[in-house]
Amino acid sequence: MAVSSDAEQKFDRVKTQLKARLGAEVYSSWFGRMKVAEASKGIVRISVPTAFLRSWINGHYLDLISELWKQEDADLLKIEIVVRTATRQGRSHAEPELAPARKMTRQTQTALAAGTVSPGRVERPPVPRPGAAVESEFRHNVLGSPLDPRYTFGSFIEGPSNRVAFAAAKAVAESQSSAVRFNPLFLHATVGLGKTHLLQAIAAESLKQNPKSRVVYLTAEYFMWRFATAIRDNNALTLKEQLRDIDLLIIDDMQFLQGKSIQHEFCHLINMLLDSAKQVVVAADRPPSELESLEPRVRSRLNGGVALEMSAPDFAMRLGMLKLRLATARIDDASLDISDEILNHVARTVTGSGRELEGAFNQLLFRQSFEPQITIDRIDEILGHIYRTGEPKRVRIEDIQRIVARHYNVSKTELLSNRRTRTIVKPRQVAMYLSKVMTPRSLPEIGRRFGGRDHTTVLHAVRKIEDLSGNDNTLAQELELLRRLINDQA
């Protein structure tokens, strides 16, 4: 049903009021993608792109939206929040049922919470207790990825680039069995942006909320190791029984899951858990649709939930991370003093991932011990290996495709397809144009990255966008916005 211009105008005024009351950052996080879908007979339906946004807005902002709309239309009876594209992939075939599951021991349930900090990402199996039965050892070992006690919701720095993912993670951790689940919840971001922090915070908070809950946190590599070891030791059935009896499965670094048989077992596991209304949370360095090493049915199942991106932290978030890190360091050394001027400078200069920021702070701590009067110029010398002042950031075509697709609300698959509808052609041409002006890639190389197109197609797109932007101020502003987003988030 077409929406009247009157309803659109009312909606625009409501959005303006929302932004004024809540601030631009909160508005952008929760309401930036709202659209009025229908307005008739006192009922207004507002659409959002995900079930998570619908649930969050219903739970936190529906009364405010209704109040603001009633100021525009006293005849309003009801506001409904609906999902624009609520498609969900079902299972393609019934999976064979495993033998009845056995209950995991209390030791297994809480092995995570007692885990020590691991110096690296390669997990090692716990040392078996002398004299313990083989099956008991196996059950104890199933939760082999330890939690880092530093990774909690309280120590996570929230901001515009991760606010939605943070809210979803808290909702999952704090939900009861009857609560709305975002299932599976899929978090994706490049390295060092807080995925592992959020996943471990979910596990820790879930155990805190319900100590009897059965929580499994492990990396994809550890999952592969466990299954390979179980198959070698003829314990595969025992492992499957343990895993099917859990309440919350959390898998990190999904992009490393390799092997047809391992992927088959993983797909079978998440199908079983999801069909049993058990929560699954997964993280990777890219969206499910771009995990090309995964079998199509695994990608399909992961695509059936809520996928949320976490992007690079802004200045305020980086400064918050540094201040939190300093406060933690002062617990061990109360005399430690790093000025606000230095923290501000580092936050402005180190613009990459949280890991780079952590490395910069560790350098500061080390130098502070024998250079207490350290200067800004000296800091630039010390941190030269972390940042290069004036060095242009390298932008990848994949980053441009991802950010342009998100901006125009299309998928990367559509961007690379042969579809010729206007809603796809314009974003595709914009992405080709930006690939030409923001990367050193040749026209033939750009064409190959866009679904194997000929270089003349790319040249046509570049020239068309150049011509249009010269006469269309709106398009010129869009291109400038996209350039900033790409430079900030690539």
UniProtKB/Swiss-Prot annotation:
<keyword id="KW-0547">Nucleotide-binding</keyword>
<dbReference type="InterPro" id="IPR013317">
    <property type="entry name" value="DnaA_dom"/>
</dbReference>
<dbReference type="InterPro" id="IPR038454">
    <property type="entry name" value="DnaA_N_sf"/>
</dbReference>
<dbReference type="Pfam" id="PF00308">
    <property type="entry name" value="Bac_DnaA"/>
</dbReference>
<keyword id="KW-0963">Cytoplasm</keyword>
<dbReference type="GO" id="GO:0016887">
    <property type="term" value="F:ATP hydrolysis activity"/>
</dbReference>
<protein>
    <recommendedName>
        <fullName>Chromosomal replication initiator protein DnaA</fullName>
    </recommendedName>
</protein>
<keyword id="KW-0446">Lipid-binding</keyword>
<feature type="region of interest" description="Domain IV, binds dsDNA">
    <location>
        <begin position="369"/>
        <end position="490"/>
    </location>
</feature>
<dbReference type="GO" id="GO:0003688">
    <property type="term" value="F:DNA replication origin binding"/>
</dbReference>
<dbReference type="GO" id="GO:0006275">
    <property type="term" value="P:regulation of DNA replication"/>
</dbReference>
<feature type="binding site">
    <location>
        <position position="196"/>
    </location>
    <ligand>
        <name>ATP</name>
    </ligand>
</feature>
<keyword id="KW-0238">DNA-binding</keyword>
<dbReference type="InterPro" id="IPR001957">
    <property type="entry name" value="Chromosome_initiator_DnaA"/>
</dbReference>
<feature type="region of interest" description="Domain I, interacts with DnaA modulators">
    <location>
        <begin position="1"/>
        <end position="75"/>
    </location>
</feature>
<comment type="function">
    <text>Plays an essential role in the initiation and regulation of chromosomal replication. ATP-DnaA binds to the origin of replication (oriC) to initiate formation of the DNA replication initiation complex once per cell cycle. Binds the DnaA box (a 9 base pair repeat at the origin) and separates the double-stranded (ds)DNA. Forms a right-handed helical filament on oriC DNA; dsDNA binds to the exterior of the filament while single-stranded (ss)DNA is stabiized in the filament's interior.</text>
</comment>
<dbReference type="Pfam" id="PF08299">
    <property type="entry name" value="Bac_DnaA_C"/>
</dbReference>
<comment type="similarity">
    <text>Belongs to the DnaA family.</text>
</comment>
<comment type="subunit">
    <text>Oligomerizes as a right-handed, spiral filament on DNA at oriC.</text>
</comment>
<dbReference type="GO" id="GO:0006270">
    <property type="term" value="P:DNA replication initiation"/>
</dbReference>
<feature type="binding site">
    <location>
        <position position="192"/>
    </location>
    <ligand>
        <name>ATP</name>
    </ligand>
</feature>
<dbReference type="InterPro" id="IPR010921">
    <property type="entry name" value="Trp_repressor/repl_initiator"/>
</dbReference>
<dbReference type="GO" id="GO:0005886">
    <property type="term" value="C:plasma membrane"/>
</dbReference>
<dbReference type="GO" id="GO:0005737">
    <property type="term" value="C:cytoplasm"/>
</dbReference>
<dbReference type="InterPro" id="IPR018312">
    <property type="entry name" value="Chromosome_initiator_DnaA_CS"/>
</dbReference>
<dbReference type="InterPro" id="IPR013159">
    <property type="entry name" value="DnaA_C"/>
</dbReference>
<dbReference type="GO" id="GO:0008289">
    <property type="term" value="F:lipid binding"/>
</dbReference>
<dbReference type="InterPro" id="IPR020591">
    <property type="entry name" value="Chromosome_initiator_DnaA-like"/>
</dbReference>
<dbReference type="Pfam" id="PF11638">
    <property type="entry name" value="DnaA_N"/>
</dbReference>
<dbReference type="InterPro" id="IPR003593">
    <property type="entry name" value="AAA+_ATPase"/>
</dbReference>
<feature type="binding site">
    <location>
        <position position="195"/>
    </location>
    <ligand>
        <name>ATP</name>
    </ligand>
</feature>
<feature type="binding site">
    <location>
        <position position="194"/>
    </location>
    <ligand>
        <name>ATP</name>
    </ligand>
</feature>
<dbReference type="GO" id="GO:0005524">
    <property type="term" value="F:ATP binding"/>
</dbReference>
<dbReference type="InterPro" id="IPR024633">
    <property type="entry name" value="DnaA_N_dom"/>
</dbReference>
<keyword id="KW-0067">ATP-binding</keyword>
<feature type="region of interest" description="Domain III, AAA+ region">
    <location>
        <begin position="146"/>
        <end position="368"/>
    </location>
</feature>
<dbReference type="InterPro" id="IPR027417">
    <property type="entry name" value="P-loop_NTPase"/>
</dbReference>
<feature type="region of interest" description="Domain II">
    <location>
        <begin position="75"/>
        <end position="145"/>
    </location>
</feature>
<keyword id="KW-0235">DNA replication</keyword>
